[in-house]
């Protein structure tokens, strides 16, 4: 019935392929909408044009099919206007004028819109009454513009900031902060910021998964009353993309050399990565050497010290190296298969190792605390 229609419209409009830019090492993005029982009109969208990332997150006032139709309109306005305009506040003004003039439903939309210059890190943004995004654990300053769809001709104020290497931008709708438990307490900004702080070095997908799990356990038996939407953008990580060819291992070592890793950790980390990556190269793509292996590095600092997080991902056959038995270390080096010491060694060298199968990918995360 109506619920299915609204849900179909909403889901059809959202980007679904993650990671979205397989050939780009400078952006890692993940987005999700978890629809409520009665569909709201939450949306997110993003794409790259001329080395600029255009992105938005919005929330339509209202529920059901009318809200999802407005959401679809907003998304197509975003796509058509950004195809020829690059200034965030001008895009917002044009979207607002178009929506206000044709707004029979009298619904308004809170929207955050950003245009990121991928080369320079310059972020031009405009906020139309939406929740402030979180940049590296701090709320991004936003001006109190009107939501769109309220008043044609409104002049939106632009804002600018610069984001840097490894920065994390977290966008969301109020379905997150206003999620209520059975005692009518809200999840709130403090909890959200605390979780973001704990997950700072993680992949965007991991961050949304953790946040969603925390919200679910907070809400408990209460019914989810609003869509839950998140968009996470990690900018310019240190990353390397390799073919699954053992000959490529030396390029991995060169890459590690170039990272700002404490000198005394260079050797153990190199060794652990070499073992883990050669494992992937040997098992993930049987009989093929056109597979890809992607390694990403993020360093975060907390009062307790530094955390170094390496993520190794591939699209090969499902294979969990953490389940392989430890190597027989009584054998001589010649008798052991290459990568055979593998996971035993990685466990010794790193503080944490975990595997997940997600979006048809093997993802192995190695963590070292300094």
How would you label these PLM feature ranges?
Residues 62, 177, 278, 282:
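Short active-site segment of divalent metal-dependent hydrolases/proteases
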